[in-house]
Design a protein with these regions (language model features):
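Short glycine-rich or small-residue beta-strand-to-loop segments that form or flank ligand, phosphate
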Residues: 13-16
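Short, small-residue-biased leader/transition segments that mark boundaries at the very start
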Residues: 1-2
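Acidic-aromatic/histidine active-site loop/patch
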Residues: 19
């Protein structure tokens, strides 16, 4: 996907899916706009997003990022966070910066009303888990 995006140089990147798809879209957006970045440098090593040691690159200069969630739970379509997993080591690297906020989120409540009950209940549990993590 990243290779193809560099070939046709889109002015808009749309992520459609759940939280993992949103995170993958954000990562692809970063890699498209700033192929020189090192994710180990960008990985969150701090407790407060405002007190970071790494200056995140300016986003949105080549393409807008639009998030279209198909499930509820992570809230990735409206948060400045993304998680990338190193396939070789299995280590997850959280990225956090307000530059990762999508330009727009298109949320269709009817989509959840017509989703399978299993997806809806799993999304609800995920949303509850995300909520509880903020308290811990």
């Amino acid at each position: 996907m990243l290779f193809r995006s560099r070939l046709f140089e889109p002015d808009c990147i749309i992520a459609l899916g759940g939280g993992s798809a949103m995170d993958a879209g954000k990562i692809m957006w970063v890699m498209y706009e700033h192929p020189e970045v090192d994710f180990l440098d960008m990985a969150m090593r701090f407790m407060d997003i405002r007190k970071r040691v790494y200056t995140f690159p300016k986003m949105g200069e080549k393409a807008y990022f639009i998030a279209v969630p198909t499930s509820a739970g992570t809230g990735s379509e409206v948060t400045p966070f993304a998680v990338i997993t190193d396939q070789d080591t299995g280590v997850k690297y959280p990225l956090a910066d307000y530059e990762l906020l999508p330009k727009m989120a298109i949320v269709d409540a009817d989509m959840m009303m017509s989703a399978p009950k299993g997806l809806t209940s799993a999304s609800g549990i995920d949303a509850l888990t995300q909520d509880r993590k903020s308290v811990v």
